UniProtKB/Swiss-Prot annotation:
Belongs to the bacterial ribosomal protein bS20 family. One of its GO terms (biological process) is translation. One of its GO terms (cellular component) is cytosol. GO terms for molecular function: small ribosomal subunit rRNA binding; structural constituent of ribosome. Keywords: Ribonucleoprotein, Ribosomal protein, RNA-binding, rRNA-binding. This is Small ribosomal subunit protein bS20. It comes from Clostridium beijerinckii (strain ATCC 51743 / NCIMB 8052). Binds directly to 16S ribosomal RNA.
Length: 87
């Protein structure tokens, strides 16, 4: 356990940020799973609508530093390819 006041504060801040990052990652994974389920079900309209929300979530996570920007770009590219192959 930390003895120094600033170290105690850093522990609190780290816990708060970890929870927030975990929440953002979890929501991102959920939207991606919904998108992939729509692709599997061959539901073109729903997949297109979900794709925009996935891209928005990925961009937000990359902007906030939760995921790396290259990872977000790679995911967007691969998911767009899945969407285009379905059409």
């Amino acid at each position: 356990m930390a003895n120094i006041k600033s170290a105690k504060k850093r522990i609190k801040v780290t816990e708060t940020k970890t929870l927030k990052n975990r929440m953002i990652k979890s929501a991102l994974k959920t939207t991606i799973k919904k998108f992939e389920a729509a692709i599997e079900a061959k539901n073109n309209e729903e997949a297109k609508a979900l794709f925009t929300s996935v891209v928005k979530s990925l961009d937000m996570a990359a902007t906030k530093g939760v995921v790396h920007k290259n990872m977000a770009a790679r995911k967007k590219s691969r998911l767009a390819a899945k969407l285009n192959s379905m059409a």
